[in-house]
Every structure is written in C-alpha cells, then in structure tokens.
C-alpha cells in the first residue's frame, strides 16, 4: 500500500482557545502519523521565527496546509510574518529559490460570516476566490501547486454535527491529499 505524502499543517490562530471550529478540525488530524501539526502561535508567541527550522520543515513535507481564520480579509499577523520571512528569496522564489517547487499548498480557513456575504454586491463585496488570490499568487511565486481551499463559513455558528462533518471530510482528504478533492 502506498504511503500518503508527508503533510505539514501550519496552524495559525491567535485565540485558539476560543475557536471551537478549529479545535474540532484539528483534533482528529492529530492522530494521522503522516501529518505534522505545527501551531505557530504556540511556537512563536514573541513572533521571533526560527527561519531555518521552518524552511527545513517545508523541505521535509510534500503538502503544506495553512489552517487559520480569515482576519481582515487575510491571515493572522504571525502567519503573514511567517510567509514574508520563511518564503524568502533564494529559498522559495527568485534566483535559486526552488525549494518548494512541485509541492502542494492548501488553505483551510474559518470565517465569521456566511458564505453569501462573500460575493460581488454582498457585505464583503468580493467572492472568497478574490479575497484568497494573494495566497494563490504566493503559492505560484513559490512554484507550488494550488489546491482549492476548504472554507468553513460562519464557523462559530455551525452546529456541532456540521463541524464534525467538516472534520471528517478534512481527515479523509488528509489521508490521501493528492488524489482527493473537496
């Protein structure tokens, strides 16, 4: 039987203790041997990122999952700092920057709004695909394959059984991330 590719799950939530949805998503994932869950806020509460360590983690994994809440139409501050520092020129992009070539990027995002608010003319003015375009472009800049994101809309208001269903789908995808869509 083929082994699944190694997955690095970069989790970034500054108030993780208050996020029921993210806890429900993460709990079953931690049982998967081929998945490394790396909580950025737990590792770097002072925002001093060990760039070489993070780059080695990226080298050691084939699939990179960025799990975070949508904050101000982007990601939490520490993840933005991580992206800017770790995906450095010469490592992930630019001259000689091919360390991530051929790897896969997937964003797993929780939002505080309903799906219908993310559309042209809606409360948030733009569809989620447009809001996430900077992440897709970053993946492309790093020569990575973009996998369609998993988005849990209105996360804090989801029923427990709905969150459990999302968590089950997440685990199923992680068990075979390069052959399953979501």
UniProtKB/Swiss-Prot annotation:
It is an enzyme of class 1 (oxidoreductase). Keywords: Cell inner membrane, Cell membrane, Membrane, NAD, Oxidoreductase. One of its GO terms (biological process) is potassium ion transport. It is found in: Cell inner membrane. Its EC number is 1.6.5.2. The keyword NAD applies. GO terms for molecular function: electron transfer activity; FMN binding; NADH:ubiquinone reductase (non-electrogenic) activity; NADPH dehydrogenase (quinone) activity. It catalyses: a quinone + NADH + H(+) = a quinol + NAD(+); a quinone + NADPH + H(+) = a quinol + NADP(+). Its main location: membrane. Pfam families: Flavodoxin_2 (PF02525). It comes from the Bacteria. GO terms for cellular component: plasma membrane. It is a peripheral membrane protein. InterPro entries: Flavodoxin_fold, Flavoprotein-like_sf, K_H_efflux_KefG, KefG/KefF. The keyword Nuclease does not apply. NCBIfam families: PRK04930.1. Interacts with KefB. Regulatory subunit of a potassium efflux system that confers protection against electrophiles. Required for full activity of KefB. Belongs to the NAD(P)H dehydrogenase (quinone) family. KefG subfamily. This is Glutathione-regulated potassium-efflux system ancillary protein KefG. It comes from Yersinia pestis (strain Pestoides F). The gene is kefG.
């Amino acid at each position: 039987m083929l082994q699944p590719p190694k997955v690095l799950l970069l989790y970034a939530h500054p108030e993780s203790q208050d996020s029921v949805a993210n806890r429900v998503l993460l709990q079953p994932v931690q049982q998967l041997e081929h998945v490394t869950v790396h909580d950025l806020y737990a590792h770097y509460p002072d925002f001093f990122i060990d760039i070489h360590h993070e780059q080695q983690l990226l080298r050691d994994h084939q699939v990179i999952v960025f799990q975070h809440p949508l904050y101000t139409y982007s990601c939490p501050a520490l993840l933005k700092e991580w992206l800017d520092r770790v995906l450095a020129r010469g490592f992930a992009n630019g001259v000689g920057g091919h360390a991530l070539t051929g790897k896969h990027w997937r964003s797993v995002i929780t939002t505080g709004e309903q799906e219908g608010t993310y559309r042209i003319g809606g409360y948030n003015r733009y569809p989620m695909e447009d809001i996430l375009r900077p992440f897709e472009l970053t993946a492309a800049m790093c020569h990575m394959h973009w996998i369609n994101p998993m988005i849990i809309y209105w996360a804090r208001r989801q029923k427990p059984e709905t969150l459990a269903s999302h968590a089950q789908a997440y685990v199923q995808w992680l068990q075979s991330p390069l052959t399953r869509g979501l």
